[in-house]
């Protein structure tokens, strides 16, 4: 994972955001350049968080969240020169990546020592049955 992060940083970072791929090779057959891909940038947030680079994860997350428009929507790409969203808009893939990155950060911020069936705060999750099946006061521990 660390090698992949280093390769992404070396070859795909552009103005601090992540390109989906480099168009310089012409492999896609399309004219023109691409801009940094919002989902890829959120994926880097998650990778930073999971690899212990939490400060960098938070910094990039803050930058990316600052790109949303006035109603909180994201597009497919971001043009750092024009400072505007470009490409498909709104882009659900970008929003899904935002949620995934936020979850990755919440895991490291909370220490994520959670056992299955517990919430991030350590409490019992709603999907675990702790109610008794009878009046004996013993828990069934599940269904």
How would you label these PLM feature ranges?
Residues 1-37, 59-110, 115-119, 123-132, ...:
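Extended glycan-interaction surfaces of carbohydrate-active proteins
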